């Protein structure tokens, strides 16, 4: 017999999921500007996730000074001379800090409470098309295999936002091309909204101010 237990978290009230439709994901200036305004709207407690180190570096150099001017510390994997675990520890300890990272941070972050209240992906975390992946893809179903990996990564990252019953957070995807099927693994109560950047900023500020 299968027993289905309800989630202890009220995702419908505590979480928001947004896909921003008017940011050019290939333009680091646009991505940096979007992250800057979203991070400021959240007052920090923000994690920016990237699928490529070079894009992380390009965005970091455009973010660090504007955030510092507003009193928000910015840490970054591949830039700060610290391992991912130490960066996450610092991020966890500083309630209003911001952190940029790639897959090691995405997979390792465990930050309950206000220290993580906003999570922003620069684009869909598709698997890297290396030789091993190509072989697995051919064996396990082509695009469906890629979809399964991306869905799992998105669901895992989303799950980092709500770790306790009193947590609340906003998940943002800066990839207008993100197909809706990839969000099927999010909790059923979470409605994914496709919005402009201005609307996303407003939703982040209003949701986290409650």
Residue locations for each model-derived region?
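ASCE RecA-like P-loop NTPase motor cores
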Residues: 1-210
């Amino acid at each position: 017999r299968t027993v289905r237990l309800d989630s202890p978290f009220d995702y419908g009230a505590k979480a928001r999921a947004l896909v921003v439709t008017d940011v050019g994901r290939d333009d680091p200036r646009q991505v940096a500007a979007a992250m800057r305004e979203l991070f400021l709207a959240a007052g920090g407690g923000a994690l920016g996730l990237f699928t490529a180190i070079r894009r992380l570096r390009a965005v970091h150099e455009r973010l660090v000074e504007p955030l510092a001017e507003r009193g928000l510390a910015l840490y970054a994997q591949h830039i700060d001379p610290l391992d991912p675990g130490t960066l996450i520890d610092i991020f966890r300890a500083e309630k209003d800090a911001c952190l940029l990272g790639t897959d090691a941070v995405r997979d390792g972050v465990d930050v309950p409470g206000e220290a993580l209240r906003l999570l922003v992906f620069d684009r869909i975390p598709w698997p890297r098309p290396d030789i091993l992946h190509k072989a697995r893809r051919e064996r396990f179903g082509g695009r469906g295999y890629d979809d399964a990996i991306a869905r799992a990564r998105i669901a895992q990252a989303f799950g980092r936002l709500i770790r306790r019953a009193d947590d609340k957070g906003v998940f943002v995807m800066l990839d207008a091309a993100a197909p809706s099927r990839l969000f099927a693994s999010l909790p059923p109560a979470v409605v994914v909204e496709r919005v402009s950047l201005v609307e996303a900023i407003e939703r982040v500020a209003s949701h986290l101010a409650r």
